């Protein structure tokens, strides 16, 4: 009773096609696909690139001076 059968989904699909038409739905689908593709490319560009010289750590030699309160 709470779930939809295949007939419910077919009726919803027919109503959506009648309201929007196939051309409008095709445009919406291509726009959505372009947005997903752009998002994936943007996520790839944000990944930090580690070069060969940055893989190792850098050592800094220095003397430690204690600050004494007088």
UniProtKB/Swiss-Prot annotation:
It is found in: Cell inner membrane. InterPro entries: TatA/B/E, TatA/E. It is a single-pass membrane protein. Residues 46-70 are annotated as: Disordered. Part of the twin-arginine translocation (Tat) system that transports large folded proteins containing a characteristic twin-arginine motif in their signal peptide across membranes. TatA could form the protein-conducting channel of the Tat system. NCBIfam families: PRK02958.1, tatAE. This is Sec-independent protein translocase protein TatA.
